[in-house]
Amino acid sequence: MKLMLIGLLCLSFPFTAAAINVGTLTFAMDQDRSFTAKRVLNNNRSARLYQVSIRAIDRPGEREVRSRPADGELLFAPRQLTLQAGQAEYYKFFYRGPQDNRERYYRVSFREVPTRLFEPGPRRGAGVNLEPIVVMDTILVVRPRQVNFAYRLDTQRGTLTNTGNTYFKFLLKPGCNSTDEEGVTEYLRPGDTVTHAGIRLKGQKFIIYNDKFISVDRSCLD
């Protein structure tokens, strides 16, 4: 999670990281969809204004290259919204870009602004108890319109490679009776390889793709 406080902290620092809630920080638009939505929840005790900004990125990560999406490629609505305390609403995203075999990634930033910052100066209480502006980054993955889901598992070398053109999650659970919480989860983008000693061992191994759990190791069934 990338969470930034932009000045204007109140003197008593009542801020908590749970003030803005957008659910999972990575969300996807499936290959047969041109629309998705993201729920925004105001967990504060007072009203907030929400705004969205979007940047195209080559690949998520510390060295990602950001650029402005082509005009009309990814649209969203509403332009901004105001939520009262405890209220939730959806931002809608519409993909109008190329219909090809390339996966696309967008960094979607949600900006939360206290509505009192827009009130006349005297009503703000002379600058005391100002609240923070918060920006939370998420990743929107638009799967290729011509999708190829494929992988290569090598239990001898302890590797799993994404040989397709769309991302998936890999869940590795030690042994045959462990819980999901005891497992290790990795995101694999096209071309990525994960190496883990547990892949060589008997255990539960799943690929999570399009909200489906796909078992890639039958060792626990023998």
Question: Language-model features: where?
Answer:
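Intrinsically disordered, low-complexity Pro/Gly/Ser/Thr-rich segments with frequent PxxP/GP/PP motifs
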Residues: 65-99, 178-203
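Sec-dependent signal peptide recognition
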Residues: 1-8
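N-terminal signal peptide c-region/cleavage motif recognized by signal peptidases
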Residues: 12-17
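Asparagine-centered strand-capping/turn motif at beta-strand->loop junctions
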Residues: 38-44, 158-166
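Intrinsic-disorder/low-complexity, polar/charged segments enriched in Ser/Thr/Lys/Arg/Asp/Glu/Gln
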Residues: 33-37, 88-90, 135-137, 155-157, ...
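Short acidic, flexible loop segments centered on an aromatic residue
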Residues: 45-69, 111, 165-181
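Beta-sheet-dominated interaction scaffolds and their linkers
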Residues: 18-44, 80, 145-153, 185-188
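Terminal connector regions
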Residues: 96-147, 202-222
